[in-house]
Amino acid sequence: MTLKRGIMLIGFLGACTMLVSAFAGELEISGTPGSPSATTTIDGKQLPPPPDDHFGGKIERSVLDSTPYWPPGVVPPKGAPNVLLIMTDDAGYGVSSTFGGVIPTPNMDRIADTGLRYTHFHSTAVCSPTRAALITGRNHHRVGSGIIPELSNGYPGYNSLMTKDNATIARILKENGYVTSWFGKNHNTPDHTISRIGPFDQWPTGLGFEYFYGFMGGDTSQWQPGNLYRDTTQIHPYDDDPDFNLITAMADEAIDYMHNIDALNPDQPFFIYYAPGATHAPHHPTPEWIEKISEMHLFDEGWHKLRETIFSNQKKLGVI
């Protein structure tokens, strides 16, 4: 599979500017105007864009004298990049080798070496506020996420409600013609809305993400995730698979999603928010990873020596 325009966001702000600025320009219609095949881009001056309820056809007394009309579908501008936004859980600034840690993350290193390392993103001590800020570009209090949903209350900034006037990245990109999805942890939906009957407006599918495969809440078992959902339907794939592992299944789901896009429309840009939760308790690494990390002897010299090593690495990288 060839995925064109590939881009990974280690930080979001710079890429957001690039995407939004790319949408500026005159509106042009491709395909036959008024037909279902007609497409256009939007200029990005107003996000989200105003609804287009203009009817460009003609209605007369007979069908023969009338002209049907479909409004043009919105597509991203030519060359719009794919966007993969990855957020790890409970992994500190000095964990990955990309930021001076001793845990080898060679693919992230490669991307960072040819791109940018963002070093000034504000991260809170609990994850929900940071997640809300990341997917909206706003201070977490502005999107009701001053605390985790389990401790939310009825006061402004702390009710865990993202209102319609605070659009997520996914909603903005979807309305610019992207396909959007969320894989992994969702710790931004209020507890009282997590049920089989919703309401679902605060779930990923109600926040601009067209597809969701992941778990609701702060943590889950990697072997038997009882809070696993596909869109808004609870699923139990581990019932028929004793070897089921969520972090592996999640990666497979995301890869299948990209394969499907490429098979149906290779020119269709996508936005994927990928939020694994395996580094959050409960810690359930697979035997293969336990063996792999153990053989590296990364922590044999103890905490103080490890701290000195990470500090030295980060000074060399210039990230502190």
Predicted regions and their residues:
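Formylglycine-dependent sulfatase
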Residues: 40-320
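Compositionally biased non-globular segments, especially hydrophobic aliphatic-rich helices
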Residues: 5, 18-20
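Bacterial N-terminal signal peptides
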Residues: 10-18
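Bacterial N-terminal signal peptides that target proteins for export
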Residues: 1-10
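Boundary at the C-terminal end of the N-terminal hydrophobic targeting segment
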Residues: 22-26
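N-terminal module-boundary/linker segments of secreted carbohydrate-active enzymes
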Residues: 30-36, 55-56
